[in-house]
Amino acid sequence: MYKKISNNEKVTRKISEVHTADNYLTKETTKNISLAVTKLTGKMDPSKLSNERVYYFISADVNFIIDGEKVHCNSGDVLYLDSDIIYSAEGDFEAVTINVPAFGVEK
């Protein structure tokens, strides 16, 4: 199987006033992995992951708080988060975001 997803096929989800996700590869395509371009311009409330997540920062000047530890990320950095981690963020970023399994699919 293969699937090409064009930019005009993405589905944009408004997570909050300052946080959006342009979803390209979703659980409707495959339950194994999802891919989005996420953007933050401000403060992200704490959340707990139910899946593994990787951020590749296209542009970034952002501080994450991960299980109480501050982690600063810049453009070109990669951040891996294991499932069950509680994290929040403050700053600005645009990132390719990959979830395994696909976002919204329980392990």
Protein language model annotation of sequence segments:
Residues 30-32, 41-43, 59-62, 101-103:
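Short, charged/polar surface micro-motifs in flexible loops or helix N-caps
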Residues 39, 48-64:
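Short, conserved beta-strand element in jelly-roll/cupin
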Residues 83-106:
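Ligand-binding loop in jelly-roll beta-barrel domains
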Residues 26-28, 43-49, 90:
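Short histidine-centered beta-strand/loop micro-motifs
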